[in-house]
């Protein structure tokens, strides 16, 4: 076995949905832990998956022994050091006739991600192809944007760069859940002004169940958290128009969203707004004339 430092494992490719269970079953028997029911994201929901992320409920002190066990398994061909345990394994029942846009190699990357499986399934949830046109990351960015706007209380006093001296708001955390925080700028060590960093103090018990998260954010149910589309429909139903627009504008300006591509419906709405404003301006000119 070779050990690599982070990044994608060499020689791996997508796995077909029919190959996921046979591949994980082999590892389950050796590791004696449930892998199939702890897959994350879009694994098992789409025809092909680029890799397999699995939630691993394990104590931090037990991770070295788990890694040693993986190293001893012939099924683990390569391993990489990262914040997760990255491995390369052979795809069981590999069907070469099933192809996708990326090359299939007969091997797949499986990432073991230590943490709370229940919460990780909520955070890394990804809708199926029939439920959304967009990647699961859009859903998480939308939730994070909602957290930045909904029930946000900023102090009137600001620092030189425009940040409020204190802000109480929601935050979408991959480790802690939905948390209510008090955010303050971090002062420079010399006492002269502030750094670009913020200090986030959790002021309420973290929320980790989907229904409770939806309720805290003023939505109807866990189903509202399913996808970008369901979240957009939910905020349009439950929030004031000005807040909805602020959330959608913030979402569309997100760098990752722009890199992937702003959703078509937001482009259309923005064009309609521009045309409406242009029409209002034209009418104003006519009235002056």
Feature annotation, model-predicted:
Residues 1-39:
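Helical scaffold of the NTase/Pol beta-like nucleotidyltransferase catalytic core
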Residues 21, 28, 67, 211-214, ...:
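Residue-level detector of alpha-helical secondary structure
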Residues 24-64:
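Active-site nucleotide-donor binding segment shared across nucleotidyl transfer reactions
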Residues 100-265:
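Catalytic cores of NTP-dependent nucleotidyl/adenyl transfer enzymes across multiple folds
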């Amino acid at each position: 076995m070779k050990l690599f430092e982070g990044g994608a494992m060499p020689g791996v490719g997508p796995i077909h949905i029919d190959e996921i269970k046979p591949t994980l079953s082999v590892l389950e028997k050796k590791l004696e832990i449930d892998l199939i029911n702890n897959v994350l994201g879009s694994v098992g929901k789409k025809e092909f998956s680029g890799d397999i992320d699995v939630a691993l409920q394990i104590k931090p002190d037990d991770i070295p022994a788990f890694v040693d066990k993986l190293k001893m398994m012939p099924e683990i061909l390569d391993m990489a050091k990262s914040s997760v345990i990255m491995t390369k394994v052979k795809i069981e029942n590999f069907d070469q006739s099933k192809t996708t846009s990326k090359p299939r190699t007969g091997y797949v990357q499986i990432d073991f991600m230590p943490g709370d499986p229940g919460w990780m399934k909520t955070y890394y949830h990804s809708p199926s192809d029939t439920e959304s046109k967009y990647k699961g990351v859009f859903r998480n960015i939308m939730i994070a944007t909602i957290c930045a706007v909904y029930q946000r209380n900023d102090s009137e006093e600001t620092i030189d760069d425009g940040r409020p001296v204190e802000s109480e708001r929601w935050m979408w955390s991959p480790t802690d859940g939905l948390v209510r925080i008090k955010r303050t700028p971090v002062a420079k060590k010399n006492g002269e002004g502030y750094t670009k960093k913020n200090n986030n103090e959790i002021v309420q018990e973290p929320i980790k169940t989907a229904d409770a998260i939806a309720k805290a954010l003023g939505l109807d149910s866990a189903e509202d958290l399913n996808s970008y589309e369901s979240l957009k429909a939910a905020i349009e139903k439950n929030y004031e128009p000005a807040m909805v627009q602020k959330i959608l504008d913030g979402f569309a300006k997100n760098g990752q969203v722009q890199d992937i591509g702003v959703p078509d419906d937001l482009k259309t709405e923005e064009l309609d707004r521009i045309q409406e404003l242009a029409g209002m301006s034209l009418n104003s000119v006519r009235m002056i004339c």
